[in-house]
Swiss-Prot record:
Gene assigned in the entry: dhl VII
Name this polypeptide is given: (S)-2-haloacid dehalogenase
Superkingdom field: Bacteria
Alphabetized NCBIfam families for the sequence: HAD-SF-IA-v2, HAD_type_II
Organism: Pseudomonas fluorescens
Chain sites annotated for binding an (S)-2-haloacid: 11-12, 41, 118-119
């Protein structure tokens, strides 16, 4: 991968653990933390896909809040305004994966420009990064807000070329979400899929360039391939 001049990362589920919200959910709804977290994330993604198809964009915070309301209604849990705000705020305080910081340090030390490209709004991306004290790691924070549509629309991925300043074939796209990795590959990025769960890749006719188990493996492979 000697032609790689920059790398862009998905945020939710790739650099940051979306299931870290389960702890807050458990504090509020004892015995339901994991089920809330899983269904909430599922509906959050579904709402972004459906809104893109319907042409009814809202920012990621609104999609996340709506998904939470559905989740609590579906599970028969009451949701007052204070609890709704507390749980929604948990998405602004996500926990980075244990290997996130070290992996990004390796890329920065190698002189590689690094960005985030996310469904999150500009505000939410900045808050997640700031709250985890990771501002040092990123040269660009790229939001779908600029095109008013969510991944996997190709207009989102085209933002990386504009903001990173390199053609797509020179930008490594990194995601743990198979659907996202497939769409990025279809767009024309070289893609590294972080397969943490040892799962099967989606059958969408567009495959990743490289598959690893975690971010540590990704950084080792990428830095060594740049030499």
């Amino acid at each position: 991968m000697k032609n790689i001049q920059g790398a862009v990362f998905d945020l939710y589920g790739t650099l940051y653990d979306v299931n870290s919200v389960a702890q807050v959910c458990e504090e509020v709804y004892s015995g339901h933390g994991d089920s809330i977290s899983r269904l909430w994330r599922q509906k959050q993604l579904e709402y972004t896909w459906l809104r893109s198809l319907m042409g009814r964009y809202v920012n990621f915070e609104k999609a996340t809040e709506d998904a939470l309301r559905f989740t609590c209604t579906h599970l028969g849990l009451s949701l007052d305004d204070e609890t709704h705000q507390r749980l929604s705020d948990a998405y602004l305080h996500l926990t980075p994966y244990a290997d996130t910081a070290d992996a990004l340090r390796r890329l920065k030390a190698a002189g590689l420009p690094v960005g985030i490209i996310s469904n999150g709004s500009h505000c939410s991306i900045e808050q997640v990064v700031t709250n985890s004290e990771m501002n040092w790691a990123f040269d660009q924070l790229i939001s779908v807000e600029d095109v008013q549509v969510f991944k996997p629309d190709s207009r989102v991925y085209s933002l990386a070329e504009k903001r990173m300043g390199f053609p797509k074939e020179n930008i490594l796209f990194v995601s743990s979400n198979a659907w996202d990795a497939s769409a990025a590959s279809n767009f024309g990025f070289p893609v590294c899929w972080i397969n943490r769960q040892n799962g099967a890749f989606d059958e969408l006719d567009a495959k990743p360039t490289h598959v690893v188990r975690n971010l540590a493996e990704m950084s080792n492979w990428l830095v060594n391939s740049l030499d």
